[in-house]
Curated annotation (Swiss-Prot):
Active site, renumbered: D246 (proton acceptor)
Similarity annotation: Belongs to the SELO family.
A Pfam short name: SelO
The encoding gene: ydiU
EC number: 2.7.7.-, 2.7.7.108
Cofactor: Mg(2+); Mn(2+)
Identification of the protein by name: Protein nucleotidyltransferase YdiU
Keyword entries, A-Z: ATP-binding, Magnesium, Manganese, Metal-binding, Nucleotide-binding, Nucleotidyltransferase, Transferase
Catalytic activity: L-seryl-[protein] + ATP = 3-O-(5'-adenylyl)-L-seryl-[protein] + diphosphate; L-threonyl-[protein] + ATP = 3-O-(5'-adenylyl)-L-threonyl-[protein] + diphosphate; L-tyrosyl-[protein] + ATP = O-(5'-adenylyl)-L-tyrosyl-[protein] + diphosphate; L-histidyl-[protein] + UTP = N(tele)-(5'-uridylyl)-L-histidyl-[protein] + diphosphate
NCBIfam families: adnlytase_SelO, PRK00029.1
Binding site for Mg(2+): N247, D256
Length: 478
């Protein structure tokens, strides 16, 4: 089957990119590809028989027209000026059978005009982390970019140490970022900002294209998508680590996996990025940062969208966030209805977990085994303050009884939203260390496990992290 590629970005948004081709690595070789995603995209298996080929930037497929996009952004709350695709190249936009498109973005593809002081490369460590994280999030049901392939090489790349250069093929419906809009707003080119908005509406919000109020309705949906995404991050214990405006997806996708982390111990102020000295991107600050980023996006639209309309959309953020978060957390607790005491029960559980540094994922998974008329719980042994747990658990079981559903019905719901497996940093690190020694077994094994996060397991994938696993530090180079 011949794949079809279109060139919408190149044709419709002149002045927003530089056309250039990838720079291949030395002795590139394919070490992993996403069979399930490839099937979804109707990619012939024969394409993966070439060790590098398009996956290593050595060849292009017919219809591809590679380019690097320019954008700007606020980093850690400070205007950083021009950024752009410093090590990634958009190879092409695949046209799927249903008429939608999928970007093929090659990360680690070499120097671009936007590389600044960088080398344009990615390392094996970071490409493995992103591939694992994006697929883990996808199977958790959270909107995200996807990983299609990883290529490693003999090219040395200099970070904290010398590491093997690698490339990741990332796919997504769009790589439109808040930073694209900021770039042209701060260059005082409001017509370019409007062109970006029109492009987004035409291709991703086409039902609004003929509406006279299209910009307000579109921005309101961007706000809602962002609020929903952040709510989902918070419920699974995901910390992004570097929520700069250039890392914010217009479509509400999780984008740019760097120093991310899933909670081990429940620590509301968890900081996963060791470069985040002030804790701006701590776990509990993510909802506020997302709103701040939306405010920066709204500012770029102010030349052609009424400020009152923008503020009205921004004002809806908190309610959308709380609605999505509340619905998901009630499911995690097994509540079939909404009752006035629900928030108090959840907050008391969080307080208990924070005091005892309870494992976030394991706590909710074990809570899924609760029988409403039994005081026995395997979760009790996870707490030192048994009296405090017993008091909370007794009131929790009374609350469960109000819903008048069977234990099996409720347990089935809870186990469908409380994962047994999340991508803990130590699991990724173990796969990385093996891969750097040439053994890809654990990389493939972990990828396969992450496809079924809600299934019970009896291996160390669902155990508490070892002591060394809790001390892992990750930075933006991750």
């Amino acid at each position: 089957m011949t794949l079809s590629f279109v060139t919408r970005w190149r044709d419709e948004l002149p002045g927003t990119y530089t056309a250039l081709s990838p720079t291949p690595l030395n002795n590139a070789r394919l070490i992993w590809h996403n069979t399930e995603l490839a099937n979804t995209l109707s990619i012939p298996s024969s394409l993966f028989k070439n060790d590098a080929g398009v996956w290593g930037g050595e060849t292009l497929l017919p219809g591809m027209s590679p380019l690097a996009q320019v954008y700007s952004g606020h980093q850690f709350g400070v205007w950083a000026g021009q950024l752009g695709d410093g090590r990634g190249i958009l190879l092409g936009e695949q046209r799927l059978a249903d008429g939608t498109t999928m970007d093929w973005h090659l990360k680690g593809a070499g120097l671009t005009p936007y590389s600044r002081m960088g080398d344009g490369r990615a390392v094996l460590r970071s490409t493995i982390r992103e591939s694992l994280a994006s697929e883990a999030m996808h199977y958790l049901g959270i909107p995200t970019t996807r990983a299609l392939s990883i290529v490693t090489s003999d090219s040395p790349v200099y970070r904290e140490t010398v590491e093997p250069g690698a490339m990741l093929m990332r796919v997504a419906p769009s790589h439109l970022r808040f930073g694209h809009f900021e770039h042209f707003y701060y260059r005082r080119e409001p017509e370019k900002v409007r062109q970006l908005a029109d492009f987004a509406i035409r291709h991703y919000w086409s039902h609004l294209e003929d509406d006279e109020d299209k910009y307000r309705l579109w921005f309101s949906d961007v706000v809602a998508r962002t609020a929903s995404l952040i709510a989902q991050w918070q419920t699974v214990g995901f910390a992004h680590g570097v929520m700069n405006t250039d890392n914010m997806s217009l479509l509400g996708l999780t984008l740019d996996y760097g120093p991310f982390g899933f909670l081990d111990d429940y620590e509301p102020g968890f900081i996963c990025n060791h470069s985040d000295h002030q804790g701006r991107y701590s776990f509990d600050n993510q909802p506020a940062v997302a709103l701040w980023n939306l405010q920066r996006l709204a500012q770029t639209l102010s030349p052609f969208v009424a400020v009152d309309a923008l503020n009205e959309a921004l004002d809806s953020y908190q309610q959308v966030l709380l609605t999505h978060y509340g619905q998901r957390m009630r499911q995690k607790l097994g509540f079939m209805t909404e009752q006035k005491e629900d928030n108090a029960l959840l907050n008391e559980l969080f307080s208990l977990m924070a005091r005892e540094r309870s494992d976030y994922t394991r706590t909710f998974r074990m809570l899924s085994l609760t029988e409403q008329y039994s005081a026995a719980s395997p979760l009790r042994d996870e707490f030192i303050d048994r009296a405090a747990f017993d008091d909370w658990f007794a009131r929790y079981r009374v609350r469960l009884q109000q819903d008048e559903v069977t234990d099996s019905e409720r347990q089935q719901l809870m186990q469908s939203v409380n994962p047994a497996l999340v991508l803990r940093n130590w699991l990724a690190q173990r796969a990385i260390e093996a891969a750097e020694k040439g053994d890809m077994t654990e990389l493939h094994r972990l990828h396969e496990a992450l496809r079924n996060p809600f299934s019970d397991r009896d291996d160390d994938y669902v155990s508490r992290p070892p002591d060394w696993g809790k001390r892992l530090e990750v930075s933006c180079s991750s």
